[in-house]
């Protein structure tokens, strides 16, 4: 019996890997990385999701929705319509938090269109939402697959923070976290902060300090990956429901970028998925990152210590008055790999070819 079962599983994994024979969407290719995409869909979130679903290196185990670019309700609707378009009702899609931990929600229809998907109306979803609360689903999957799940958050970090607050025991069981957020070269919301971090700084600080392997794919590297007219034209040459939807979304974004004098749209969220596919796409040295939660001008900034040490100042009493004296350097332990450079052309080619089904 055991032999028969082994034969059956070997045949199954073979068939799954041969294109066009049998590829039940519910099963990832053998050895594919299990990911949970936590997203606020969102135009570039849509690109991230479709890249993940079209990449055999990844096995999307769940999609959890967080408010950010759009409200929680609109985000869930968008996620459901997208998985339906991709014929992937097998993937659980769960709503999560309704608002950031300690502040009011800020939504970004200004950038993402009134429905969050570049005003492209997808058909109603055939898929139903998973009844579980997003953070609970994250906990359940991490516990079901210890050391196998990679979390890919591409929105505010509220759901991830709620998951670790509820069950801190999942932290050592997560394989890694690859998040889109932050910047070490200024923000997009204001001079200091990037949107995903700004929209829930306390949650972000919890996620950065949790103590798990974490890669930050920030604004500054995303800004080096511009999807422009050349890529749009390539994507327009092939067709299919997902291909055409992606063409519409990227056209909306390219036109938007041109209105602001840019030559293309930054691939923020899809790049985080790209790094999950191939970590070599970015150069990411280890640093210690803290999230500023109080600064008057800097709330939501990711403050990265690039030297991984700080000066040790000790208070001394002198006849002329008290002062601090630098006595040495203290090591700071890195808590993140921070992306500082990216193979942009390679990534853009990967994105277009995957969306074309290659
Ligand atoms: C991030 O903010 C959102 O608008 C995008 O989806 C991306 O996740 C970029 O700052
Ligand atoms: Ca996003």
Regions found by a protein language model. Give the residues of each.
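N-terminal secretory signal peptides that target proteins for export/translocation
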Residues: 1-7
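Bacterial N-terminal signal peptides
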Residues: 10-24
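Conformational coupling and interaction surfaces
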Residues: 31-32, 50-51, 59-60, 198, ...
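A residue-level signal for conserved active-site and pocket-lining positions in enzyme catalytic cores
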Residues: 93, 207, 273
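Active-site histidine-anchored catalytic micro-motif
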Residues: 30-39, 46-81, 115, 119-224, ...
